[in-house]
């Protein structure tokens, strides 16, 4: 391919990447040309990602997850999306994926479930990525205005505290004082 190499990060994103029949071939071209290749997906078709994860276990895959079942379904317009994504992520873990996680877009409608999703990722042994204070047309808003910033700040503070506690627990096992 004529595409140059040396990219730090390449993210294959949407629309929805798993709608492409040639997603594995796209990964075949991009994987050797970047330090990190990521697929950002809604996570509803994990079986299409299994061959990619088996071929490239270090590929970074993030499923969009906006909270518990009802919240995720409301924001994403999905039916049973939460369970499908959790079960799908387990399939990718079983397939040998090493850089897996959920992506959470913080907004007024779901900020109260941020710690829940973080705890879920800890239990599953996967990552959590967040995009904060964001809304847009795909979240049924056009003003891109976050209304309850104080509530979001408190939720982020709680998440950071939880993460620091987790780090402290981990460090105590690695380097006991």
Show the residue positions of the predicted features:
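Radical SAM enzyme [4Fe-4S]-AdoMet core and its adjacent flexible, acidic
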Residues: 1, 28-29, 33, 55, ...
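Conserved Radical SAM active-site core
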Residues: 1-58
């Amino acid at each position: 391919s004529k595409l140059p190499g040396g990219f730090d990060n390449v993210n294959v994103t949407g629309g929805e990447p798993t709608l492409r029949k040639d997603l594995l071939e796209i990964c075949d071209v991009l994987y050797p040309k970047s330090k990190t290749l990521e697929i950002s997906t809604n996570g509803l078709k994990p079986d299409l990602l299994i061959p990619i994860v088996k071929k490239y276990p270090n590929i970074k895959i993030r499923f969009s997850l906006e909270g518990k079942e009802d919240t995720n379904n409301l924001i994403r317009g999905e039916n049973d999306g939460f369970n499908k994504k959790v079960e799908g992520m387990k399939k990718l873990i079983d397939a040998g994926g090493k850089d897996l996680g959920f992506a959470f877009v913080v907004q007024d409608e779901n900020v109260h479930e941020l710690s829940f999703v973080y705890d879920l990722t800890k239990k599953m042994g996967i990552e959590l990525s967040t995009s904060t204070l964001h809304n847009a047309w795909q979240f049924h808003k056009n003003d891109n205005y976050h209304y309850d910033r104080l509530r979001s700040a408190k939720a982020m503070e709680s998440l950071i505290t939880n993460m620091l506690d987790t780090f402290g627990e981990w460090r105590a096992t690695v380097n006991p004082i």
